[in-house]
Amino acid sequence: TRGPGEKKLEMDRRLIKNRIAQLNRELREVKRHRELTREQRTKNRIPVVAIVGYTNAGKSTLLNTLTGAGVLQEDQLFATLDPTTRSRKLPSGQEILLTDTVGFIRKLPHHLIDAFKSTLEEAKYADLILHVVDASNPQMDEQMYVVYETLQRLEAMDKPVVTAFNKMDRIGESLTVRDFKADRIVQGSAKTGEGLE
């Protein structure tokens, strides 16, 4: 005979299974919507720039500074879960779209990459990768490696890369850095706007 604990366990399992099914349906819908949006952008020929970087590098702050987006800026893991895209006109008059992505972390488990795949895919389909690096972080080199390793796993390393060494206001001096994967390097501060011209 079954006791009340077993019935509760079965009910909890069913609720969890239903919730997982609902989330999978929602993820499929989000993926479908993003694919349609990407098709529309391609049709309109608006270049897309994916803002990528290690967690807390200042990606959302940079997006806000460049576009006035008002995206949540938090010093916490996975503060950005859903990519935000905003437009900006360049001095030449060309319109571009900037997309903020989830921050990368070291040893991100494969199942989490799968969970964030629809968010991280923005980098795969972008025309340019803007790699934001926290220049004040002592583990900057390791974090850069993690970002490139993740982009490689996403098959997104065939794009031009601009590396933006951010938070220069915290270190107060220019860096002598090398990024062999970058086509161009800039230094500045998303917080103060310095170096973003």
Predicted regions and their residues:
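Structural beta-sheet core signal
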Residues: 131, 163-165
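Ordered, soluble secondary-structure elements with a strong preference for glycine-centered loop motifs
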Residues: 10, 75, 110, 138-141, ...
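Conserved nucleotide-binding/hydrolysis micro-motifs of P-loop NTPases
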Residues: 102-105, 135-139, 167-172, 190-194
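Inter-motif core of Ras-like GTPase G domains
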Residues: 112-137, 149-156, 189
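Conserved P-loop NTPase nucleotide-binding/switch module
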Residues: 138-151, 177-180
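Conserved G1/Walker A P-loop phosphate-binding module
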Residues: 1-128
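Canonical P-loop GTPase G-domain recognition
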Residues: 157-162, 169-197
